[in-house]
Amino acid sequence: MVDALRDYVAAFILAGLDPHIGSELEFFAPSVDYFGARNVSREKVERDLVRYDERWPVRRFWLDGGIIVQRRTGTSIEFVFPLRYELRNGSKHASGKVMKSLSLIAGGDNEMQIVAVNESKAR
Protein backbone atom coordinates (compact mmCIF):
# COMPACT_ATOMS: atom_id res chain seq x y z
CA MET A 1 0.00 0.00 0.00
CA VAL A 2 2.83 2.43 0.82
CA ASP A 3 4.41 1.96 -2.62
CA ALA A 4 1.05 2.43 -4.35
CA LEU A 5 0.41 5.61 -2.35
CA ARG A 6 3.88 6.95 -3.13
CA ASP A 7 3.30 6.20 -6.84
CA TYR A 8 -0.05 8.01 -6.70
CA VAL A 9 1.53 11.08 -5.06
CA ALA A 10 4.38 11.05 -7.60
CA ALA A 11 1.90 10.93 -10.48
CA PHE A 12 -0.13 13.77 -8.91
CA ILE A 13 3.00 15.91 -8.50
CA LEU A 14 4.05 15.25 -12.10
CA ALA A 15 0.57 16.17 -13.31
CA GLY A 16 0.95 19.51 -11.51
CA LEU A 17 4.03 20.22 -13.61
CA ASP A 18 2.30 19.42 -16.90
CA PRO A 19 1.31 22.55 -18.84
CA HIS A 20 -1.85 20.66 -19.92
CA ILE A 21 -4.28 21.39 -17.07
CA GLY A 22 -6.30 18.26 -17.82
CA SER A 23 -3.50 16.04 -16.53
CA GLU A 24 -3.94 17.32 -12.98
CA LEU A 25 -7.70 17.74 -13.26
CA GLU A 26 -8.14 14.00 -13.98
CA PHE A 27 -7.16 13.26 -10.36
CA PHE A 28 -10.17 15.14 -8.96
CA ALA A 29 -13.66 13.80 -8.30
CA PRO A 30 -16.60 15.73 -9.84
CA SER A 31 -17.07 17.59 -6.52
CA VAL A 32 -14.30 18.22 -3.96
CA ASP A 33 -13.54 20.06 -0.75
CA TYR A 34 -10.96 22.42 -2.21
CA PHE A 35 -8.66 24.34 0.12
CA GLY A 36 -11.40 24.88 2.69
CA ALA A 37 -14.29 25.45 0.27
CA ARG A 38 -16.83 22.63 0.34
CA ASN A 39 -18.41 20.94 -2.69
CA VAL A 40 -16.38 22.75 -5.34
CA SER A 41 -17.20 21.63 -8.88
CA ARG A 42 -14.57 20.23 -11.18
CA GLU A 43 -15.12 23.24 -13.47
CA LYS A 44 -14.17 25.63 -10.64
CA VAL A 45 -11.10 23.52 -9.87
CA GLU A 46 -10.16 23.72 -13.54
CA ARG A 47 -10.49 27.52 -13.55
CA ASP A 48 -8.31 27.72 -10.45
CA LEU A 49 -5.66 25.48 -12.02
CA VAL A 50 -5.66 27.66 -15.16
CA ARG A 51 -5.16 30.81 -13.02
CA TYR A 52 -2.34 29.12 -11.10
CA ASP A 53 -0.66 28.08 -14.36
CA GLU A 54 -0.90 31.63 -15.71
CA ARG A 55 0.48 33.10 -12.48
CA TRP A 56 3.32 30.58 -12.17
CA PRO A 57 4.19 29.17 -15.61
CA VAL A 58 7.54 27.80 -14.41
CA ARG A 59 7.26 25.48 -11.42
CA ARG A 60 8.99 22.64 -9.63
CA PHE A 61 7.42 20.39 -7.02
CA TRP A 62 8.92 17.45 -5.17
CA LEU A 63 8.07 15.15 -2.30
CA ASP A 64 10.18 16.14 0.70
CA GLY A 65 9.64 13.32 3.16
CA GLY A 66 7.34 10.48 4.01
CA ILE A 67 3.62 10.07 3.48
CA ILE A 68 1.60 9.94 6.69
CA VAL A 69 -1.69 8.03 6.50
CA GLN A 70 -4.20 9.64 8.85
CA ARG A 71 -7.25 7.47 8.21
CA ARG A 72 -8.14 4.53 6.02
CA THR A 73 -11.41 2.68 5.38
CA GLY A 74 -12.37 0.10 2.78
CA THR A 75 -12.86 2.63 -0.03
CA SER A 76 -11.14 5.80 1.21
CA ILE A 77 -7.85 7.08 2.55
CA GLU A 78 -6.68 10.40 4.01
CA PHE A 79 -3.00 11.28 4.15
CA VAL A 80 -0.53 14.16 4.28
CA PHE A 81 2.89 14.64 2.75
CA PRO A 82 5.54 17.37 2.70
CA LEU A 83 5.81 19.11 -0.66
CA ARG A 84 8.57 21.53 -1.65
CA TYR A 85 7.99 24.02 -4.42
CA GLU A 86 9.79 26.60 -6.53
CA LEU A 87 7.63 28.91 -8.65
CA ARG A 88 8.69 31.50 -11.20
CA ASN A 89 7.14 34.02 -13.54
CA GLY A 90 9.75 36.29 -15.06
CA SER A 91 11.47 38.11 -12.18
CA LYS A 92 8.84 37.01 -9.63
CA HIS A 93 9.51 33.85 -7.69
CA ALA A 94 8.36 31.96 -4.64
CA SER A 95 9.62 28.86 -2.88
CA GLY A 96 8.92 26.95 0.28
CA LYS A 97 7.41 23.86 1.78
CA VAL A 98 3.81 22.89 2.53
CA MET A 99 2.10 19.94 4.12
CA LYS A 100 -0.36 18.81 1.46
CA SER A 101 -3.37 16.79 2.59
CA LEU A 102 -5.42 14.61 0.26
CA SER A 103 -8.53 12.52 0.79
CA LEU A 104 -9.21 9.87 -1.84
CA ILE A 105 -12.10 7.55 -2.57
CA ALA A 106 -12.30 4.66 -4.99
CA GLY A 107 -14.33 5.63 -8.04
CA GLY A 108 -16.63 3.39 -10.06
CA ASP A 109 -13.73 1.90 -12.02
CA ASN A 110 -11.75 1.50 -8.78
CA GLU A 111 -9.54 4.47 -9.68
CA MET A 112 -8.76 6.67 -6.70
CA GLN A 113 -10.14 10.21 -6.97
CA ILE A 114 -9.35 13.26 -4.84
CA VAL A 115 -12.41 14.35 -2.85
CA ALA A 116 -10.56 16.82 -0.60
CA VAL A 117 -7.32 18.77 -0.89
CA ASN A 118 -5.73 21.30 1.42
CA GLU A 119 -2.32 22.50 2.51
CA SER A 120 -0.60 24.44 5.24
CA LYS A 121 2.84 26.00 5.45
CA ALA A 122 5.37 23.52 6.80
CA ARG A 123 7.86 24.53 9.44
Residue positions per predicted region:
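A mature extracytoplasmic/lumenal domain signature
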Residues: F28-S31, R38-N39, I67, F81-Y85, ...
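Short beta-strand edge/turn micro-motifs at domain boundaries
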Residues: A94-R123
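Short solvent-exposed beta->alpha transition segments
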Residues: L25-W62
